[in-house]
A protein has these predicted regions:
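Charged, gly/pro-rich active-site loop segments
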Residues: 2-4, 83-189, 229-323
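A short mixed-secondary-structure module that forms the rim of ligand-binding clefts
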Residues: 41-82, 217-253
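A short, Trp-centered hydrophobic/proline-enriched beta-strand micro-motif
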Residues: 18-28, 72-76, 198-205, 243-245
Length: 323
């Protein structure tokens, strides 16, 4: 049997090694997509054809969905405060596996990468207690890459280079949700929130099951939703569930501001696209590093406590063991 490892280009590897944050997309049971910002800290091995990121064990819902349907995508979409100067937009798609109990050796090996991207690890009696769950109760999401698509610019325009499996046909339209497709949140207020975030990404499930994530611009709104603009040919015609991410960040992810949406995307035959948001949630991280770490530590503690108390952590382990 021949080698099926996907090996991406030098340009894509430079982006993957350099970006401070990446948009991670996963599929929902209803056929939608959720897209969230994560810190990959340079995780990736081109020789093995793998990428990855870490997250908290307290985020059980996200992890459970990835375990149930491991089709994921990672969109390397911004050079802010990273180590790459490439103008390319890189979309990697693959099958994820979740390492729920990484070995101490793996966590220790990961430490220097965290320092490079996110700054020195805090240590000392108070910090050790505060950040125990944030530092130690981490899980790794490893992605066996099936395809890497590289566009020549961050707007994803121009002819892309594809490494791995060829791109599938456009995804067919989906049936609308029972609750209807119209907006369920205040569109005008939401567009005001999005306008403050320079990075905006739209995601949906492709015909082969992998999420597709592309950069978009927001161009006006009305009672039906807000209009999104992408390079010609990127958005599939028809209606479908879709996720949306808008965010900004400072060096080492201090002052991170993010807003995540789920909703309905409708693309007309002429390419005009309207997004009707159904859910919206966001947060703004503290603008100072120590305050950010305190916030992260407390959220990790609460998430881990909630996951343990509800039995979500054990259910997740049992589900992962079945796969």
């Amino acid at each position: 049997m021949g080698d099926t490892t996907v090996r991406w280009s030098d340009q894509a590897d430079d982006v993957i090694r350099g970006d401070l944050t990446v948009a991670a997309a996963y599929v929902t049971p209803a056929g939608g997509v959720v897209v969230a910002g994560v810190a990959p800290c340079g995780l990736g091995d081109r020789d093995r054809g793998t990428l990855g990121f870490t997250t908290s064990l307290g985020l059980g819902k996200k992890l459970e969905r990835i375990v149930r349907d491991p089709h994921v995508a990672l969109a390397y979409h911004a050079r802010d405060h990273g180590f790459s100067t490439s103008p390319a937009y890189v979309l990697a798609q693959g099958i994820a596996s979740v390492d729920l109990e990484p070995s101490p050796a793996r966590l220790q090996e990961f430490g220097p990468q965290v320092v490079r991207y996110l700054g020195e690890l805090k240590q000392g009696p108070v910090w050790d207690r505060l950040l125990r769950e944030y530092y130690a109760e981490r899980v790794f999401v490893d992605v066996d890459v099936a395809r890497v698509v590289t566009w020549p610019d961050l707007g994803a325009s121009g002819e892309p280079d594809v490494a791995g499996a060829g791109g599938p046909a456009p995804a067919p339209p989906q049936d609308p949700p029972k609750g209807g497709t119209r907006p369920r949140v205040d569109v005008a207020r939401l567009v005001g929130q999005l306008s403050a975030q320079p990075h905006r990404l739209l995601a949906w499930r492709g015909a082969d099951g992998f999420p597709v994530v592309v950069p978009v611009a927001v161009a006006g709104h009305d009672t039906s939703g807000f209009r999104v603009v992408a390079p010609p040919g990127l958005l599939p015609a028809g209606g479908r569930r879709a996720g949306f991410l808008a965010h900004s960040y400072r060096p080492q992810l201090v002052g991170l501001a993010t807003r995540m949406l789920t909703g309905w995307l409708d693309v007309a035959d002429d390419g005009a696209a309207v997004y009707a948001p159904h859910t919206s949630k966001g947060f703004m991280a503290p603008p100072r590093k120590n305050l950010l770490l305190v916030s992260n530590g407390l959220m990790a503690k609460f998430g881990y406590w909630r996951s343990s108390r509800s039995g979500a952590a054990e259910r997740l382990r049992a589900l992962a063991a079945e796969r």
